[in-house]
């Protein structure tokens, strides 16, 4: 009796609400221009991976033959090299697990390229740590010898009559070894003429004085004034003297 009752009740029950909805096909397809996940999966599965693998093997074998013909050694791609203390993933043909400062790496590179060693402050040293013969016999940079009358004091002509010590010092102060500027005013030989300015510039040594002489020879004092005079410099013949004789080229 109970089974028959329940069977009749189930026959009169309405179907579930989900079954009443009509399936809509627009939800099953993705918008235009966008592929669904299944389509992407099918596309990846259809990709010809075997052909790509074969091409890679062909390139690798050709590269190995190139290294063998050039006398180089090929290494496994799983090795790593350390350059400057930082590890990098190494490609084919690099040194395994060595830094540029490692002597063993330097020895290997000398057998391959034999170039100069840049790890020792730019000196031309082989990877074996020995100086080449030409580097030992090579002379150093040539220096221009100073003239016999070179001194640590320069005598300067061509300064305007109204020049001040501060203005002249501003010209010579940028040079290495500069020490002092001394100005000596002399009365003009002509009545009413401008006074004559004798200028002496002291440096630490004759080499510093020669550098300033070479750089400032013919220096135009006033670039705006077209009639401005040009500096004329020479080594002072008597560096210890504080004043000169009569005339612009007296005893110096």
UniProtKB/Swiss-Prot annotation:
Domain RRM: from-to ranges: 152-238
Pfam families membership: RRM_1
Record bears the keyword Nucleotide-binding: no
Source species, domain of life: Eukaryota
Gene3D superfamilies attached to this UniProt entry: 3.30.70.330
Gly residues biased stretches: 242-252
Entry keyword set: RNA-binding
This protein's name: RNA-binding protein 2
Organism: Medicago truncatula (Barrel medic)
Lineage: Eukaryota, Viridiplantae, Streptophyta, Embryophyta, Tracheophyta
């Amino acid at each position: 009796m109970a089974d028959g009752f329940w069977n009749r009740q189930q026959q009169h029950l309405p179907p579930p609400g989900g079954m009443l909805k009509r399936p809509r096909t627009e939800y099953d397809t993705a918008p235009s221009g966008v592929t669904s996940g299944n389509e992407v999966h099918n596309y990846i599965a259809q990709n010809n991976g075997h052909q790509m693998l074969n091409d890679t093997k062909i390139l690798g074998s050709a590269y190995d033959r190139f290294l063998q013909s050039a006398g180089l050694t090929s290494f496994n791609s799983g090795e790593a090299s350390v350059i400057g203390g930082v590890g990098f993933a190494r490609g084919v043909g690099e040194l395994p697990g060595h830094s540029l400062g490692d002597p063993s790496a330097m020895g290997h590179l000398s057998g391959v390229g034999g170039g100069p060693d840049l790890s020792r402050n730019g000196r031309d040293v082989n990877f074996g740590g020995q100086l080449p013969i030409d580097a030992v016999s090579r002379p150093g940079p040539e220096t221009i010898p100073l003239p016999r009358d070179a001194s640590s004091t320069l005598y300067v002509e061509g300064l305007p009559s109204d020049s001040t010590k501060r203005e002249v010092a501003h010209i010579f102060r940028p040079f290495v070894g500069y020490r002092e500027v001394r100005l000596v005013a002399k009365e003009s030989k002509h009545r009413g003429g401008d006074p004559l300015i004798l200028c002496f510039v002291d440096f630490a040594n004759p080499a510093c004085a020669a550098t300033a002489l070479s750089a400032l020879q013919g220096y135009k004092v006033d670039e705006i004034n077209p009639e401005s005079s040009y500096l004329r410099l020479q080594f002072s013949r008597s560096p210890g003297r504080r004043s000169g004789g009569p005339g612009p080229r007296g005893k110096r």
